[in-house]
Every structure is written in structure tokens, then in C-alpha cells.
Amino acid sequence: MLSSYSMIRDSWKKLKKSDIYPVQKARMVSWRKSGSVVRLDYPTRLDRARSLGYKAKQGFIIVRSRVRKGGQHRPKIMGGRRPRRLAYNKLTVKKSIQLIAEERAADKYPNMEVLNSYYVGEDGLYKYYEVILIDRSSPAVLSDKNVSWIANSANKGRVYRGLTSAGYKSRGLGHGRLGSAKSRPSIRANGRLRR
């Protein structure tokens, strides 16, 4: 017999065939009307949140972050010139959309650190991620040996330095040496070294 977490995971893997699909469609309508960064009482995907380190205790919060889909546009060009020369369309950012969602959540809660994040849905315009944030000065966090490392000063602002899972992926790290020779010490520093 499957555990409850396994059943939740399986229903998210085959979302369109599962019982939660009508609920998810209704969520998309309400989520689009809500703000871009919204604090939640409990995670939408409990199995995923727990596997990434979430605990239902003081010092942990869940935030839903909304980010645009697709390529980036610069602000509209005003004045006479050729748009082609100003790279208005088809900009490919070097950060993943998930990392942008994490950074926006961290901007909204400056006293907290991003632990991790996971995908919860998308509609025609936006992608939605839930971000796990930890209060680095909470006594419950400081006394927990599994997460007290986040209070260390070396982990301050970790999301802005690409130290979360989404950040590692964007930097081309996380799969050993093979295929990441030009990613160390960082992409920018490696470019300087090769000049």
C-alpha cells in the first residue's frame, strides 16, 4: 500500500489524469488575480516541500511566487531608431525563471533566507513556484541541527549568489567535473582567465 506522500507525488506526476486536476485549474484562476508574492499557511505540494527541507515549525514559511513565462522583453523603445539594434525582443536571461522567483520572494522577506523552491503550476501568462524561506534568527531554527547552518554568516544572501539548487543549475554546476569545465570558479571569472 502506498504512503500518503507517495500518493500525492503520483497525482502530481500525472496531473491531467489525477483527481486534483479540476482543483488545480480553479487554483490557476484565483492565483492570477492574487499578488506576485503571496505568503501561504501551508504548502500546496506537501511531499515536495518536505523532501526539500520544509518543517511545520516556527521560523519556516512558504511563499508562492509568480513569474512571467517565456523570453524577456526590454522596456518599450521611445524615439526614432531601429528596434533591431537595441535587442528589444528574444532576450534570453542567464538566470532560470525559478531563480528569479526565489529572488523576488527573498526581496519581499529580507530577514529570511531561501532554502529551496519547487514548481506548482503555470497558465498562459505565468509560472508559479513555492519558495521555502527560513528565519535565520529564530530560536527554533538555531536549535535545530539540520537547518542551523543557514544562520551562518557565509549563507547570508545565498539566493543572490546562486547557492540554491536553482542557482547551481543556472551556473552549470551540480553534475561533477564533466561538462562544467568553464563554470569554475565562476562563468564570469573563467571568461576573465581565458582573455
UniProtKB/Swiss-Prot annotation:
Single Gene Ontology BP annotation: cytoplasmic translation
Keyword DNA repair: no
Region (Disordered): 174-195
Record keywords: Ribonucleoprotein, Ribosomal protein
NCBIfam families: PRK04243.1
HAMAP family found in the cross-reference section: Ribosomal_eL15
Family: Belongs to the eukaryotic ribosomal protein eL15 family.
Name the record gives this protein: Large ribosomal subunit protein eL15
Originating species: Picrophilus torridus (strain ATCC 700027 / DSM 9790 / JCM 10055 / NBRC 100828 / KAW 2/3)
Taxonomy of the source species: Archaea, Methanobacteriati, Thermoplasmatota, Thermoplasmata, Thermoplasmatales
Gene that encodes the chain: rpl15e
